[in-house]
A protein has these predicted regions:
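Catalytic-core helical/loop segments in enzymes performing group transfer/polymerization on anionic/lipid-linked
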Residues: 1-637
């Protein structure tokens, strides 16, 4: 035991002897790193997957910053990001962040959690590193050095470092997938969010000519405002809109209401109204918006004069990170606040143009949805939150569920899928009269088909990789584990002579695993668009990474499911992973479990039977969700 302790002490002492610690968090600093490392006795620490990968490819010895954090640290970072993102609720600053009774600070929370998780993780890593190497000089980017100034006086910036690395906002830097062409002759590419927004505005201008019902609504009719709904995804809902006395108004600010022939036809046949910026904007509104921006600029100056509050609130484990975060956050909030003035005024005008009986949203997290919730409360309009994905029905997953806007904290009614989520909501203390299990429109056309069922052409892998808003997901271990999981599935299906199709999760940040698949088998097909249900219908087996809604799709379609565990978020185990409706496995057991499901009919049939039972618990009114949704809205008004 004494020898082991001495060895640890020697290793620790060796670590302290490095003259320079190079903090490598941006591949744009690679040239500076090469020059610095070649001249001095130094230790290199990478801070994300990209920097780790390039150092590994160049065979440059280095450590990863994750090594300085424990799982407990990662959980604490996540919890702190959630709590700090609630800064806007503090009484001392509340009078400076309201505009027309809408809390502007609350509108950035969803994006801010993403920013904070990444930032706090780096802050705590640098703090731990500074304590480990007390005698060393730290060399790094402007971003790293700005933070490290709080922990060490011995810092040197890379000569050519640029500040922009730390100032890219998640929503602004998102690349939007665009597809042009026809079904069998098309190409997909990604464009910036700003370009997408401009193209969206141009595409919406002809809507009043293409959709004659816009602006021809009866004054006393009952109107439902539907916010951020995709017509193709909610096809059966849109198909049934015309068969009711309700008038539906679609208001999509993040995505266009229609973008191709199919979505246009659905909108037209639904007889709904499309409202856009172009249909609401005029010279009077323009003046109101300009005046509002002038007003809020003054309030923002007063807001950030509360230095002591921000210094105290923006802290982690007793360590304030406000001094390094201040400039970024001030500019960020000002930018978003000015953008929100226009959005608030547009939505206010829309809500004055029609008398809405209720409002339908898919999440409480989005900025436009939060505006609607706050403006609706002023007008006493009930808001209905429609569950839009399978959720972690666990106590451990509560904070994450709230952050994602799937818990009805502000909505008047919660339209959930079925019994399991209904019971979970009650356990959270949500009143029974607020919860309504009505099924889900997207599953209306997901049904067992004997002809397609018998095809069993391939194994289907549904990816659901690490996100950028969870501290554990940011670690190299989880990122590489996800890639290794995909590679392992490719290798095993090839080994067993099975065709493999990989369906990529629709998130814009999702890894495209084409390069992994090609390394193993060039015949593996990777699909990154379209619905997954038709693919499940013809597959022999679905392999889902972790817990995802596609498990329910497969249960409904009578397909066996393997859930391959990759991430470690601490969200607990949801019912679907405990009720034997799918075979839960990991990388070590995957080979044996895959072989069993493919070759043992008894195991396969039992999984299918359990899956069918689970789907009945998760989803009420199967194949009838749209009718139940419309029926509920009719009764509500």
């Amino acid at each position: 035991m004494e020898k082991k302790l001495n060895a640890k002490r020697v290793f620790k002492d060796m670590n302290k002897n490095y003259q320079f610690i190079i903090l490598f968090d941006s591949i744009s600093d690679l040239d500076d790193l090469d020059k610095t490392a070649s001249k001095n006795k130094s230790k290199i620490i990478s801070f994300d997957y990209d920097t780790h990968r390039i150092l590994k490819e160049k065979k440059i010895n280095h450590e990863i910053s994750d090594n300085y954090l424990s799982k407990k640290d990662l959980r604490a970072i996540q919890k702190t990001a959630y709590s700090v993102s609630e800064w806007f609720n503090a009484d001392i600053i509340s009078k400076h962040i309201y505009y027309k009774e809408v809390n502007l600070g609350s509108l950035i929370q969803d994006e801010l959690i993403n920013i904070l998780v990444n930032y706090i993780k780096k802050v705590f890593e640098l703090y731990k590193i500074s304590k480990q190497f007390t005698n060393s000089t730290f060399i790094g980017s402007q971003a790293c050095c700005k933070i490290m100034k709080d922990f060490s006086k011995k810092i040197i910036e890379f000569k050519n470092s640029e500040a922009e690395n730390s100032e890219q906002l998640p929503l602004d830097s998102t690349k939007v997938r665009m597809k042009i062409g026809i079904k069998n002759h098309s190409m997909e590419f990604r464009i910036s969010k700003n370009l997408f927004t401009r193209l969206k505005g141009i595409s919406e201008k002809p809507s009043k000519f293409l959709l004659p019902k816009n602006h021809s609504i009866e004054e006393n009719s009952k109107n439902i405002l539907v916010i951020e709904f995709n017509a193709i995804r909610y096809q059966t809902f849109f198909e049934q809109m015309a068969n009711t006395n309700l008038n539906f108004t679609i208001y999509n600010r993040r995505n266009p209401a229609f973008w191709n022939a199919q979505s246009y036809n659905l909108i037209k046949q639904s007889d709904c109204i499309i409202e856009t910026k172009n249909s609401l904007y005029d010279t009077n509104l323009k003046k109101i918006i300009l005046d509002g921006k002038t007003q809020i600029k003054t309030e923002i100056l007063d807001l950030f004069s509360h230095e002591n509050f921000f210094k105290s609130f923006f802290s982690f484990d007793g360590i304030s990170f406000w001094s390094s975060f201040k400039v970024f956050f001030t500019n960020y909030f000002k930018k978003r606040a000015l953008e929100f003035i226009e959005e608030i005024e547009l939505l206010k005008k829309l809500m004055e143009k029609y008398t809405f009986s209720s409002i339908l949203i898919l999440s409480e997290a989005g900025s436009n949805e939060r505006m609607a919730l706050q403006l609706a409360r002023q007008k006493e309009i009930p808001v209905c939150l429609l569950q839009h994905g399978v959720i972690y029905d666990t106590i451990e997953g509560y904070d994450m569920n709230v952050a994602q806007g799937v818990v009805p904290l502000k909505s008047d009614h919660y339209l959930c899928w079925g019994k399991i989520t209904e019971e979970y909501s009650k356990r959270l203390g949500i009143k029974s009269e607020k919860i309504h299990a009505i099924g889900y429109p997207i599953f209306d056309k997901v049904r067992f088909d004997e002809q397609d069922y018998s095809k069993n052409d391939y194994v289907l892998l549904a990816t659901s990789g690490p996100t950028k808003e969870d501290a554990s997901d940011l670690t190299i271990e989880i990122i590489e584990k996800n890639m290794n999981a995909i590679k392992k599935v490719c290798q095993l299906t090839t080994k067993y002579n099975k065709k493999l199709i990989i369906k990529i999760h629709p998130s814009p940040d999702e890894l495209d695993p084409s390069f992994i698949a090609k390394q193993v088998n060039s015949k593996i097909k990777v699909i990154n668009e379209g619905k997954i249900s038709p693919l499940i219908q013809s597959c022999e087996l679905l392999i889902a990474i972790d817990f995802t809604s596609v498990i329910l799709d497969a249960n409904l379609l009578g397909k066996p499911v393997i859930s391959l565990s990759v991430k470690d978020n601490g969200w607990g185990i949801p019912p679907a992973l405990k009720n034997n409706s799918c075979l839960v496995t990991d990388l070590e057991k995957l080979n044996d479990d895959l072989k069993d499901v493919l070759n043992n009919e008894q195991i396969r049939n039992q999984l299918i039977k359990n899956g069918m039972k689970s789907s009945n618990e998760y989803l009420s009114y199967q194949n009838n969700g749209s009718s139940k949704l419309i029926g509920f809205l009719e009764e509500l008004v």
